[in-house]
Structures are given as structure tokens and as C-alpha cells.
Amino acid sequence: MNYINKCLLFLLVSVSFVSIAQKKGDAKSLFEYQGRIEKIQDDKVVLIGSASSVSFDFKGNSCSISLQSVENHQNYVSLELDGKYIGRVRIEKGDVKSFPITVSNDNKTHHLSIYKATEAANGGVLFAGTSAKLVESATSKKKKKIELIGDSITCGFGNDASTIPCGSGEWYDQHNAYWAYGPILSRSLNIDFVLSSVSGYGMYRNWNDEHLDEAIIPDVYENLYLNRDNSKPYDFAFQPDLVSICLGTNDLSDGDGKKTRLPFNEEKYVSNYIAFIKTVYKHAPNTRIVLLTSPMVSGEKNVTLVKCLKKVILTFESDKKHKPIALFEFKSMSPKGCGYHPDIADDKVMAEQLIPFFKKILNEK
């Protein structure tokens, strides 16, 4: 049974686990969704991409949420209550389960956000309802929007070893996209965001594959689930004011040292990057694009990366239809997360570097 069929089956099971407002049929306006998600029915939703989320306001001190990992393994979400991070929750494989949320003993209105901590490659997380007494959210001011395209660094891979140490469990047990650099800076700037990122993927090849057996970001970007399945295209309804692209770490990687690895091909990297930017413009013609270097690339490799990115930018220099493409260079770091990836502290450093740069661009007329 595939995961969507499983979702539909368990939706029937969870009919009783809805709020009074949902039963009245007016819950459509009471849930807010962000990121790459798939709506099923009755405001049930599959969270797909890293940091994709569902949020709602509720009144009182009683709240439970119904979640399911729709793959045959555990998954994770991160929770934010009233603007404060309250932890990462492990969702074991199996049926829909209820997770209680501890709320202060008052009759105030609260805001809960549920973020997918893992990435698209780890399978979906089904949000199947809440027991809370939902109330309508106050009308929020229209926010600027940003899309962050990237690889494991953008996903938040290996940044949270607070419960399972690095090297233990599965490769996604330390994922926490809530604390990836993109969501951190987005919260700081009070902007809406979507992450379009896949661990291990590059612009023309992957960290250990020469684009022979595995996909690359340009192959999957237009597909909702960020995989080769093009039967469910991404609708691109989210129109970002700024698109950030951080790809190159895996293209420049030496692989695992066992599988054949060819020398880095600057021409392929640059030509693929140019074609990919044209794809981004096709779906978001009014956006401003920023190309990022990698905090995990240094020395001669970083010199090569910067040179290639400048070639890409130069190609679009005479393009009058779109806003100028910018370049941002991270300061190199020695990441302290799992698998030589940034940990949460490193992600905060990356976000702090980007915040003034992105703020200036977003405020430009």
C-alpha cells in the first residue's frame, strides 16, 4: 500500500479526532500551511519538504495533535508554541497517533506550529487533526517571501544530536529543519519561507554519483515530492520575493573514495546552473536570485566555486527582464554537526551572516 492510500485509510480512522470548529465545516480558514505540502481532504495534509508546516490558533489549555509517519520508519516534527520552540517529536511507524501538547493553565488563545524536521527523502508526515478548540487567527500582515534551494546544509541534516548521538540510529535521526539556517533567518526577518532541498544532491552531480544512477536538483525541483515522480508537479503558488540557491558542495565533493569520481567539471556545473536559473525564472519571474557559496567548501575548491558562480552571474548581466543576480560568500567554518555538517550553533552563525544581506535586498524597491 503506498503512502497516499495509507493516508486516506487513516483519515477515516481519525474522523473522531477533530475539533468542534472542524465539524462545523469552517476549519478551512483556521489552518495555515507553509512549504511543500499535499492537501488530502478535510484540512488533513501531508508535510513533505524540510520545515513544511501546519499552524493554527486555539483557545484553552487542552490540545493534542494527530500525526503519522506515512513511511515504514520513524519520522520527526518540531513544535513551536506561542512563538517558542518546545522540542522535536519522534513519530514511530504505524497508525495515526495522538500527541498531547502541554499548555499553560489559562483560557488564552495560543498558536501552535508543527514543522517537519526531516526532509522529503524521508517520506511524508501526515497531520490528521487536532482536539483543540480552534479559533480564527488574527489577520496577519502580508509578509515577504523567500525560497531556499539547496542540499543537506539547507535541510538541516545532522544538526541536532540532542537525543541520538552522531553515528547512531538512522541517517535522518539528527535532522532538525526548524533549526536550519533558512528557517532561522526567516523567523528573524519575519518572512514566509519554503525549503526546496535534498541531501546529497548537486547542480550537475551528487556527492557520490556522476548523475548516472541518482537525480540532481534540476531533475526534481519541479516535482512536488522532490523526487523523480513527475505525476504530482509542484504548483509554484508560493511566489518568493527572493530565491536563495546554495548548491555546489556535493558537486565539488570527492565522494566516498570507493566509487569512481571524475574531476570537477566547471563547464557542466556552470551550464547546468544557468539552465536551472532559467527554470526558477519560469516559475517566479519577478523574484530576486542570490547565489550562495558553501561554508563547507574552502581553499582551492572555494576559489573554483566562486569563479563558477561569477561566470553564472555574468551570463545574466545583460538580462533586463529580471533583477540582478547577487552573490553571497559564507565565511568558512569547521562544522560541528554529524557527518561534517553544521550543527544548530553553526546554522545560527550562517543565519547571522545572511540576515543583513537578505534584509537589504528584501527592502530594496
Q: Which stretches of residues belong to each language-model region?
A:
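Surface-exposed acidic, glycine-flexible loop patches that form ligand/cofactor-binding
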Residues: 136-139, 230-239, 278-284, 318-319, ...
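Extracellular serine-dependent O-acyl
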Residues: 287-293, 301-338, 344-365
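Positively charged n-region of N-terminal signal peptides that target proteins for export
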Residues: 1-7
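Structural recognition of the beta-strand scaffold that forms the well-ordered cores
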Residues: 145-149, 154, 193-197, 241-246, ...
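Conserved SGNH/GDSL esterase-like catalytic core that processes O-acyl groups on lipids
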Residues: 50-51, 119-122, 165-263, 267, ...
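A structural motif corresponding to the C-terminal end of an alpha-helix
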Residues: 181-192, 276-288, 315-323
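N-terminal secretory targeting modules
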Residues: 7-13, 19-149, 153-174, 362
